[in-house]
Curated annotation (Swiss-Prot):
Residues 289-299 have a biased composition (Basic and acidic residues). The modification N5-methylglutamine is found at residue 237. Residues 289-326 are annotated as: Disordered. It is found in: Cytoplasm. This is Peptide chain release factor 1. It comes from the Bacteria. Belongs to the prokaryotic/mitochondrial release factor family. Pfam families: PCRF (PF03462), RF-1 (PF00472). Methylated by PrmC. Methylation increases the termination efficiency of RF1. InterPro entries: PCRF, Pep_chain_release_fac_I, Pep_chain_release_fac_I_sf, Prokaryotic/Mito_RF, RF-1. HAMAP family: Rel_fac_1 (MF_00093). The gene is prfA.
Length: 375
């Protein structure tokens, strides 16, 4: 049965969030209002289910009273009441299962905007072309979810590929939509430059960095070197005539060095702001990775799917098939043409479902162990 105390806490939080959303001070603070709106959307499905359960329990109680009423002798009415009891009991069991899923641990980063980094791996020019194919796939996927993808920097090649692309993805639950993409992506196809029709295998890596919360990372600007230069990318007249592009280098010349380039727009100020935003996200990711490494060491086990060293997905062009190696059975393979057109939703849904099933299994095992220990 769902944890009642936890449910009550979340319902109370929902009420508090609704009251805060009506507070003029919250409306005046754009960041706080966005946070409250996001939390309201997160809690609404759970609160809706809790209210439905309360109504179903009240209806069930009324139907049972009707069945037990000695003055009720109409057999048709009694049969209807029995059917209602059965239907309500079945629905309450469904609600209970749905609430258990909604109470599973959630990723606190799910509602955040994202820095998306694509890098060519093994395969030379073909890997760079694959990077651009992935970028177009993510652009279409994002558009379908009403997310905005904006390229901040791209190291493009003459053949139409890119060794690196850095983009910002903003909108509701951007991280939740893209977090499953972290890792090594492999492509198998005949490159455009291949004259003998041989299939080549190339790779690209994808990093998905959630935006850093204010105060999450203490970025000391005295440790950041800012360089400005003329943009090297496309953008029409004026792009290359002013020093609008910005390079931010954290702890230059040290093992901790991080370099970020932003040449998205013509405004040096905006490019500087975006570069520091990406730099902060990378620092936050580095700190998270360090914490995870420490946790892995302490429990002497590997953190599964999502490790960047894993090949998470293979794109097989000759067979028009995308295989996600984290999935099993019917969920494992998907039509390549649909996926490359932005149809990632079935893959993402399957991954989220598999994670929920693993969490539910872990919870049931913990519960069984607790009962065994109590016995």
């Amino acid at each position: 049965m769902a944890n009642m105390s936890r449910l009550n806490e979340l319902v109370s939080e929902f009420g508090l969030v609704e009251r805060r959303l009506g507070d003029p001070q919250a409306l005046a603070d754009g960041r706080e209002y966005a946070r409250l709106t996001r939390r309201h959307r997160e809690l609404l499905p759970l609160v809706t289910l809790v209210r439905e359960r309360e109504q179903a329990e009240a209806d069930l109680s009324g139907a049972r009273e009707l069945l037990q009423d000695p003055d009720m002798r109409d057999p048709d009415m009694k049969e209807l009441a029995q059917l209602e009891v059965g239907g309500l009991q079945a629905r309450l069991a469904e609600i209970e299962a749905e609430l258990e899923v909604l109470l599973l641990p959630t990723d606190p980063d799910d509602g955040k905007d994202v820095i998306l980094e694509l890098r060519a791996g093994a395969g030379g020019a073909e890997a760079g072309l694959f990077v651009m194919d992935l970028l177009r796939m993510y652009e279409r996927y994002a558009a379908g979810l009403n997310l905005k993808l904006n390229v901040l920097d791209a190291a493009e090649s003459d053949l139409g590929g890119a060794s690196k692309v850095v983009a910002e993805v903003t909108g509701d639950f951007a991280f939740r939509a893209l977090k499953w993409e972290r890792g090594v992506h492999r492509v198998q196809r005949v490159p455009a430059t291949e004259s003998q029709g041989r299939i080549h295998t190339s790779t690209a890596t994808v990093a998905v960095l959630p935006e850093a919360e204010p105060g999450e990372v203490n970025l000391d600007l005295s440790e950041v070197r800012i360089d400005v230069f003329r943009s090297q990318g496309a953008g029409g007249q004026g792009v290359n005539t002013t020093d609008s592009a910005v390079r931010a280098v954290y702890r230059a010349g040290t093992p901790d060095e991080i370099m970020v380039i932003c040449q998205d727009g013509r405004s040096q100020i905006k490019n500087r702001e975006k570069a520091l935003q990406v730099l902060t996200a990378r620092l936050a990711e580095r700190e998270r990775a360090a914490r995870e490494a420490q946790e892995r060491q302490e429990r002497a086990s590997q953190v599964g799917s999502g490790d960047r060293s894993e090949k998470i997905r293979t794109y097989n062009y000759p067979q028009n098939r995308v295989t996600d190696h984290r999935l099993e059975g019917e969920d494992k393979n998907h039509p390549l043409d649909a996926v490359m057109a932005g149809g990632l939703a079935p893959v993402v849904s399957a991954l989220a479902r598999a994670q929920r099933e693993e969490q539910l299994l872990a919870m049931s095992q913990e519960g069984a162990e607790d009962q065994h220990g109590a016995a």
